[in-house]
């Protein structure tokens, strides 16, 4: 009997490894399959990719939730995924199992764009030491530069006045408010990151916003899902460059802004902005290979703050103005409260919010109804967890369906209608139901929540203090349905802004 040579052993070794892996997989499946969440039967190779409408993900998930319950499974290509719906299941996932559900799955298209160990930013970074370091830095630095203080409030108020001036220049004319809203919220973020603001007609600002919108469009829909499910496609010459051209252009714009900031940075002086503070940390971390403070990660952190902190606020404000022209009775009541609490002379302040329950309720209802981030960024389990008595194994992608709480019929009296009374009790006091969670919760909650709340209140009250908004003469009322992308934006619309008579 001949002995097998080294060459002959290779097929045997490969077969043995595959056999062991299959036995292990079978054992694992036997352990948890009976308690794994139900879901639609996946197709070979593609899984459920073509069974979910990525152009209207919330409605697809709503139908699946009605069929399979608050916790159900999907198979996106070969990636197992569990969708979490409803307040009870969401709290279990985000809070009870928070330590085991705070991680992010790898996203191949962002790895292609430079997100890698040591330069993963904050939003997409895996849950670990680098993420904690950058989260602490971002929160503390935003606080140092005025978050929650009068200094930042004054800056936002000044920007709100610039926004009002832009509306005044076009008063009485049909206008699309979105470009002006984008510019104002961009300037707030730019003030924190670069200590600068741009004039609304600055060609650089206009180009940057156009590229940012293009970049966000590129990472929503079917194409990025296919690229993430089959990352080998990213190796096809020019395919990824063409599909992600806006992303690369936006990163290049930010890189140029950082270079400008770096040339004027004086390490001896107190930091002027977040970029200066990060550069100081880079200097401190020299020689420490474990540190996440480096030039590449600075670019990723800045990209995260711009992407997450700018269009989310401007899109919510766009919803607010559209809903005001659709509900003039609500608009008049907000203006009445503004006149009673603030008047027409002084600017709104955050301290006024506690005395304006109806305005506060309207802003929160805009967030609930607009539902601009219906599906939160995916998580991945770092250990086996249990949610609603279902066993979800380690390595499963979790998709938090935030819309399932904001439109829950058991929580909201009129979930599909704009109804500010959702946030008022019988005595007219402001109340916030537990299911209102637009900024998520737990370890991965939005780090810019306080800034977003400040911007929404100050911009909204400044605008309604100065103007009355209406549907332009001769135009039909806009639809109150959303347009789905990476954010849910209101359907395109125009409005007329009329300067209010201060003697009313």
Swiss-Prot record:
SUPFAM superfamilies: Cytochrome P450
Disulfide bonds: none
Co-factor requirement: heme
Reaction(s) catalysed (UniProt annotation): an organic molecule + reduced [NADPH--hemoprotein reductase] + O2 = an alcohol + oxidized [NADPH--hemoprotein reductase] + H2O + H(+)
Principal location listed in the UniProt entry: endoplasmic reticulum
GO MF annotation list: heme binding; iron ion binding; oxidoreductase activity, acting on paired donors, with incorporation or reduction of molecular oxygen, reduced flavin or flavoprotein as one donor, and incorporation of one atom of oxygen
A GO CC term attached to the entry: endoplasmic reticulum membrane
Compartments (UniProt record): Endoplasmic reticulum membrane; Microsome membrane
Stretches of the chain forming a coiled coil according to its record: none
Catalytic class of the enzyme: oxidoreductase
Keywords: Endoplasmic reticulum, Heme, Iron, Membrane, Metal-binding, Microsome, Monooxygenase, Oxidoreductase, Phosphoprotein
Induction per the UniProt record: P450 can be induced to high levels in liver and other tissues by various foreign compounds, including drugs, pesticides, and carcinogens.
Gene3D superfamilies to which the protein is assigned, alphabetical: Cytochrome P450
Membrane topology classification: Peripheral membrane protein
E.C. numbers: 1.14.14.1
The keyword Hydrolase is assigned to this record: no
Phosphoserine found at: 249
Family that this chain belongs to: Belongs to the cytochrome P450 family.
Protein name: Cytochrome P450 2D9
Organism: Mus musculus (Mouse)
Organism classification: Eukaryota, Metazoa, Chordata, Craniata, Vertebrata
Gene that specifies this protein: Cyp2d9
